[in-house]
């Protein structure tokens, strides 16, 4: 009987072999635990129309499950807001938190396949860091991921992607994400 070998994600392997050493030299860390790494990736899809039609949330759940390979959590309204015809407990979005190997695989697919498929894409804004090295950006449609069949999309949905790093500053986070292959605009 053969034993199956666990395959490391390509981006994780590259981080451990090249990127970690380059960041250590660039910032002069004394301890290996100071070197920034990606902690988690949170993918959020807001579905405000689900307040009027509860079936719309199923399409968002299916799309996000295909894109991330993990079952999304349905997010519900915490407060009732009359102007939006929203009641407490109604579904308003779906969210997935990716960690470990799934996170590395998702980042690899995002940077090498999905972002280059965006029409008129000129790079990500380098100014969307939160002050402690984490980066948040949005995608206008889910069709840029090759897992989603364009013919089976019931409606175009955007999503927010939050890449949480262990970096202490925005410069460290920017250097890490640039080394991982995130295409930032040059000012």
UniProtKB/Swiss-Prot annotation:
The keyword tRNA-binding applies. GO terms for cellular component: ribonucleoprotein complex; ribosome. Signal peptide: none annotated. Part of the 50S ribosomal subunit; part of the 5S rRNA/L5/L18/L25 subcomplex. Contacts the 5S rRNA and the P site tRNA. Forms a bridge to the 30S subunit in the 70S ribosome. One of its GO terms (biological process) is translation. NCBIfam families: PRK00010.1 (NF000585). GO terms for molecular function: rRNA binding; structural constituent of ribosome; tRNA binding. It comes from the Bacteria. InterPro entries: Ribosomal_uL5 (IPR002132), Ribosomal_uL5_bac-type (IPR020930), Ribosomal_uL5_C (IPR031309), Ribosomal_uL5_dom_sf (IPR022803), Ribosomal_uL5_N (IPR031310). Keywords: Ribonucleoprotein, Ribosomal protein, RNA-binding, rRNA-binding, tRNA-binding. Gene3D superfamilies: 3.30.1440.10. This is one of the proteins that bind and probably mediate the attachment of the 5S RNA into the large ribosomal subunit, where it forms part of the central protuberance. In the 70S ribosome it contacts protein S13 of the 30S subunit (bridge B1b), connecting the 2 subunits; this bridge is implicated in subunit movement. Contacts the P site tRNA; the 5S rRNA and some of its associated proteins might help stabilize positioning of ribosome-bound tRNAs. It comes from Mycobacterium bovis (strain BCG / Tokyo 172 / ATCC 35737 / TMC 1019). The lineage of its organism: Bacteria, Bacillati, Actinomycetota, Actinomycetes, Mycobacteriales. Pfam families: Ribosomal_L5 (PF00281), Ribosomal_L5_C (PF00673). This is Large ribosomal subunit protein uL5. Belongs to the universal ribosomal protein uL5 family.
């Amino acid at each position: 009987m053969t034993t199956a070998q666990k395959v490391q994600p390509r981006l994780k392997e590259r981080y451990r072999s090249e990127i970690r050493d380059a960041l250590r030299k660039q910032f002069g860390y004394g301890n290996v635990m100071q070197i920034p790494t990606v902690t988690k990736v949170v993918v959020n899809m807001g579905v405000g129309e689900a307040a009027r039609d509860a079936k719309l949330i199923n399409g968002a759940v299916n799309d996000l499950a295909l894109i991330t390979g993990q079952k999304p959590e349905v997010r519900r309204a915490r407060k009732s807001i009359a102007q939006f015809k929203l009641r407490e407990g109604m579904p308003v979005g779906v969210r997935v938190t990716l960690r470990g190997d799934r996170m590395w695989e998702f980042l690899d697919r995002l940077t090498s396949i999905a972002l280059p498929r965006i029409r008129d894409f000129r790079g990500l804004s380098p100014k969307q860091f939160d002050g402690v090295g984490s980066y948040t950006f949005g995608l206008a449609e889910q069709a840029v991921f090759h897992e989603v069949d364009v013919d089976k999309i019931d409606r175009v949905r955007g999503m927010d992607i939050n890449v949480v790093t262990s970096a202490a500053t925005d410069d460290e986070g920017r250097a890490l994400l640039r080394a991982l292959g995130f295409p930032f605009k040059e000012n």
